[in-house]
Amino acid sequence: MTASMRLK
C-alpha cells in the first residue's frame, strides 16, 4: 500500500 492510499 502506498502513502497516498493511506490518506484516503
From Swiss-Prot:
Keywords: Leader peptide, Plasmid. May regulate expression of the erythromycin resistance protein. This is Probable msrA leader peptide. The lineage of its organism: Bacteria, Bacillati, Bacillota, Bacilli, Bacillales.
